[in-house]
Amino acid sequence: MTATPKPLVLIILDGFGHSESHKGNAILAAKMPVMDRLYQTMPNGLISGSGMDVGLPDGQMGNSEVGHMNLGAGRVVYQDFTRVTKAIRDGEFFENPTICAAVDKAVSAGKAVHIMGLLSDGGVHSHQDHLVAMAELAVKRGAEKIYLHAFLDGRDTPPRSAKKSLELMDATFARLGKGRTATIVGRYFAMDRDNRWDRVSSAYNLIVDSTADFHADSAVAGLEAAYARDENDEFVKATRIGEAARVEDGDAVVFMNFRADRARELTRVFVEDDFKDFERARQPKVNYVMLTQYAASIPAPSAFAAGSLKNVLGEYLADNGKTQLRIAETEKYAHVTFFFSGGREEPFPGEERILIPSPKVATYDLQPEMSAPEVTDKIVDAIEHQRYDVIVVNYANGDMVGHSGIMEAAIKAVECLDVCVGRIAEALEKVGGEALITADHGNVEQMTDDSTGQAHTAHTSEPVPFVYVGKRQLKVRQGGVLADVAPTMLHLLGMEKPQEMTGHSILVAE
């Protein structure tokens, strides 16, 4: 290791895809002189961040968890979405020992099976087909009382698209002859990840005690009433459907989200005896199952155990005596640490982490710069003092403001990013450092939905930029994917890649 590291900085612009279309494209509408200059003067190209290229089903848009897993692993990582879907197709899901044990315990005691999760075809945190399969499993194993607690999307799907998903579940329960939708609530409340416990408590109290300001005879009627209150899917307030279906001691509760970050908080409320972030009216003693492991510290079993990834970038750098910094604001901190490290919570030796709090605003269109300037201050300081060999940073703006669907805010967000990238590039030039700029998936390059005319709030399957910033004479090869980024970094560091990394350097000599 050199005495004064000249850092290699990986800049991940979250949700910053590439599209030639100008319609609803915040990136092309924005003034971005720094990125324009880098595209003209530095080696750059496009790489894939979606579908089979990142271990998702063909055509499936990428997301932040998947993107960071692939970026850090240096290999295509077979995703939980694909694992669960395959298990359902193969029939293994219906024999899953963890789920079956919880359901069988409830059934033998004459208790209910509660299925909860994000009900949509977005495929980012969950998929509605998985919830259908869970209802089928419960019926096959003899459950008489089956209740669905549906979290509505409108973020990874169009803002008002939940009706068809609710109708799918109604049709499923009718076909099975058992089960019904018991509650609906927007993901804004049920799937927080920033310790906004007032939101989480409204979802928990709805599910456990049927406590709700709104009631409806059917899920679709409840949804239509929410639309009449001007609440899009994501923001639908707690609504009880039909008779109360309280969660009781001995019931089974299966959380069908496969993505961890937005499933942890609600899970903790259910299973932690010493939970103190808000006062629970009740904590029923249930047979709780997480579809995947949301965190190693959560005292509940998971149906699909986490697979371990060996020799991810962070581990390999540590084993070779390199120092590294991971930095992001709250919204993406888990991605640049836990997910980038292949599902590992603890830092590697020589790894430091900086968490910058995200602004406490209801939605990020109200503060589109988010905490990017503060993140950049810390990075520039680290570069100037040459403290680390490698710095990995995530800028949340493109994704989080992109999800708002508000074009003006998205333009401000990416213009802020341009300034931040410029500051990093300037600091690196002074010390002889290098950077790679890329993204985990698309979003902010498509802010309007061509087919519906509504705001487009979901991710896209567009390719993402890849830019080398430095003095070497290199060119970008075609056909790169996110899994090629870690091997590219090792190439720049003059290190052989470990055999577990199947990706290949995107940069080649001119």
Swiss-Prot record:
Cellular component GO terms, alphabetical: cytosol
Gene3D superfamilies reported for this sequence: Alkaline Phosphatase, subunit A, BPG-independent phosphoglycerate mutase, domain B
Binding site for Mn(2+) 2: D14, S64, D440, H441
Cofactor remark from the record: Binds 2 manganese ions per subunit.
Cofactor requirement: Mn(2+)
UniProt-listed NCBIfam families: pgm_bpd_ind (TIGR01307)
Biological pathway: Carbohydrate degradation; glycolysis; pyruvate from D-glyceraldehyde 3-phosphate: step 3/5
UniProt keyword terms in alphabetical order: Glycolysis, Isomerase, Manganese, Metal-binding
Gene this protein is translated from: gpmI
Binding site for substrate: H125, R155, D156, R187, R193, R259, A260, D261, R262, K332
GO MF term (any one): phosphoglycerate mutase activity
GO process annotations (BP): glucose catabolic process; glycolytic process
Annotated Mn(2+) 1 binding sites: D399, H403, H459
Active site: S64
Reactions the enzyme catalyzes: (2R)-2-phosphoglycerate = (2R)-3-phosphoglycerate
InterPro entries from the UniProt entry: Alkaline_phosphatase_core_sf, BPG-indep_PGM_N, Metalloenzyme, PGAM_B_sf, Pgm_bpd_ind
Its job: Catalyzes the interconversion of 2-phosphoglycerate and 3-phosphoglycerate.
Assembly: Monomer.
Uppermost EC category: isomerase
KW Transferase (keyword) present: no
Protein family: Belongs to the BPG-independent phosphoglycerate mutase family.
Domain of life (superkingdom): Bacteria
Annotated source species: Pseudomonas syringae pv. syringae (strain B728a)
Protein name according to UniProt: 2,3-bisphosphoglycerate-independent phosphoglycerate mutase
